[in-house]
């Protein structure tokens, strides 16, 4: 299996489990590769770290939820694995240059 295929398989697995606690330890265990080698391979293929990919994917899912539902921001944050609404809002604002509430109401 090529590095591209390995990473694509892992990305599919990550996307299926994005609502669960995910970090380099969990994904490395799933892949069977060392954390160091997995990070290197992931960055070579995707041009971003595994942590960046997971964060970006969660934030994109949150943005869809904010656009398409009236679910409370707290619930969206918890469902996507954030430990608090404040943490979620800070990370969301850093990515989208607005708070989740502003994002929801400006669309």
UniProtKB/Swiss-Prot annotation:
<dbReference type="InterPro" id="IPR018060">
    <property type="entry name" value="HTH_AraC"/>
</dbReference>
<comment type="function">
    <text>Transcriptional activator of the superoxide response regulon of E.coli that includes at least 10 genes such as sodA, nfo, zwf and micF. Binds the DNA sequence 5'-GCACN(7)CAA-3'. It also facilitates the subsequent binding of RNA polymerase to the micF and the nfo promoters.</text>
</comment>
<keyword id="KW-0010">Activator</keyword>
<dbReference type="GO" id="GO:0006355">
    <property type="term" value="P:regulation of DNA-templated transcription"/>
</dbReference>
<feature type="DNA-binding region" description="H-T-H motif">
    <location>
        <begin position="25"/>
        <end position="46"/>
    </location>
</feature>
<protein>
    <recommendedName>
        <fullName>Regulatory protein SoxS</fullName>
    </recommendedName>
</protein>
<dbReference type="GO" id="GO:0043565">
    <property type="term" value="F:sequence-specific DNA binding"/>
</dbReference>
<feature type="DNA-binding region" description="H-T-H motif">
    <location>
        <begin position="73"/>
        <end position="96"/>
    </location>
</feature>
<feature type="domain" description="HTH araC/xylS-type">
    <location>
        <begin position="8"/>
        <end position="106"/>
    </location>
</feature>
<keyword id="KW-0805">Transcription regulation</keyword>
<dbReference type="Pfam" id="PF12833">
    <property type="entry name" value="HTH_18"/>
</dbReference>
<dbReference type="InterPro" id="IPR050959">
    <property type="entry name" value="MarA-like"/>
</dbReference>
<dbReference type="InterPro" id="IPR020449">
    <property type="entry name" value="Tscrpt_reg_AraC-type_HTH"/>
</dbReference>
<keyword id="KW-0804">Transcription</keyword>
<dbReference type="InterPro" id="IPR018062">
    <property type="entry name" value="HTH_AraC-typ_CS"/>
</dbReference>
<keyword id="KW-0238">DNA-binding</keyword>
<dbReference type="GO" id="GO:0003700">
    <property type="term" value="F:DNA-binding transcription factor activity"/>
</dbReference>
<dbReference type="GO" id="GO:0005829">
    <property type="term" value="C:cytosol"/>
</dbReference>
<dbReference type="InterPro" id="IPR009057">
    <property type="entry name" value="Homeodomain-like_sf"/>
</dbReference>
<keyword id="KW-0963">Cytoplasm</keyword>
<dbReference type="GO" id="GO:0001108">
    <property type="term" value="F:bacterial-type RNA polymerase holo enzyme binding"/>
</dbReference>
């Amino acid at each position: 299996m090529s590095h591209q295929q390995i990473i694509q398989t892992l990305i599919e697995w990550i996307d299926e489990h994005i609502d669960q606690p995910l970090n380099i330890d969990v994904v490395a265990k799933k892949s069977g590769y060392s954390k160091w080698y997995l990070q290197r391979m992931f960055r070579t293929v995707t041009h971003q770290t595994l942590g960046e990919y997971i964060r970006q994917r969660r934030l994109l899912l949150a943005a869809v939820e904010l656009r398409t539902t009236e679910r409370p921001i707290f619930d969206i944050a918890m469902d996507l694995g954030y430990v608090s609404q404040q943490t979620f809002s800070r990370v969301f604002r850093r990515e989208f240059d607005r708070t989740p509430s502003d994002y929801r109401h400006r669309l």
